[in-house]
A protein has these predicted regions:
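Flexible loop/N-cap segments at domain edges
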Residues: 97
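Helix-centered, glycine/charged polyanion-binding patches within enzymatic domains
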Residues: 119-120, 124-154, 160-161
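A conserved mid-domain beta-alpha-beta active-site/ligand-binding segment of alpha/beta enzyme cores
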Residues: 146-184
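A conserved beta-strand-loop-helix scaffold within acyl/acetyltransferase catalytic domains
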Residues: 4-92, 101-112, 116-117, 121, ...
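Alpha-helix termini
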Residues: 92-94, 131
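Helix N-terminus capping/helix-initiation residues
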Residues: 18-19, 102, 141-143, 161-163
């Protein structure tokens, strides 16, 4: 049984957060994947304390990506996701909002936060690989995009005759695979 104090979304005030450091600190503390880049960050405040954050990244005009949602890990935050999302929908013009759920944590495509917010299942995204380096931080995954051969050659002087995997191994990185994603769309 969860013994953390309850906070209800209906008692929260929603505000746009313009200070990225506040958003990054909150996400690093309360989201399993930590911070990410964003265009708009909305905060849920209860008695002037930040208890929830939802971030959106503008892909192109009218197309958005809901890329992070987190609540204070020391509280049961009920209804805050819905309140933050409704605020975005009411106040920011959009054609489509997409979001991706990690299949390690989201298995039911019909009964989860996305469907409760009005998103519809779009597709499964196949598994892909990431890198991590236990000497740097064993808990942080690095996206494969930063490990392209040309990039590693330019940054570290590694010969282009090596494969990406050989280059990353030489640099102390290990390749790990995820379970894929579930893509949701809100129109």
């Amino acid at each position: 049984m969860n013994r953390n104090p309850k906070i209800f979304g209906r008692k929260c005030e929603i505000r746009e957060i313009t200070n990225k450091d506040i958003v990054y600190e909150f996400l690093d503390k309360n989201h399993i994947q930590g911070r990410t880049g964003f265009t708009i960050a909305l905060g849920a405040y209860c008695q002037n304390n930040l208890v929830g954050v939802m971030t959106f990244k503008k892909e192109k005009e009218g197309y958005w990506d809901l890329n992070r949602f987190a609540t204070d890990i020391n509280h049961q935050c009920i209804g805050i996701g819905g309140k933050l999302f409704k605020h975005f929908v009411r106040n920011y013009p959009f054609i489509e909002i997409k979001s991706f759920a990690d299949r390690r944590w989201t298995t039911d495509t019909d009964n989860n936060l996305y469907t409760k917010l009005g998103f519809e299942f779009d597709s499964y995204v196949p598994p892909t690989y990431w890198y991590y380096n236990p000497k740097i931080n064993p808990y942080i995954r690095f996206h494969k995009f930063g490990f392209r051969k040309q990039h590693l050659h330019k940054q570290y002087g590694l010969p282009l005759t090596m494969t990406e995997r050989e280059m990353t191994t030489a640099l102390g990185y290990t390749r790990i695979w995820d379970c894929g994603l579930i893509k949701y769309v809100y129109k």
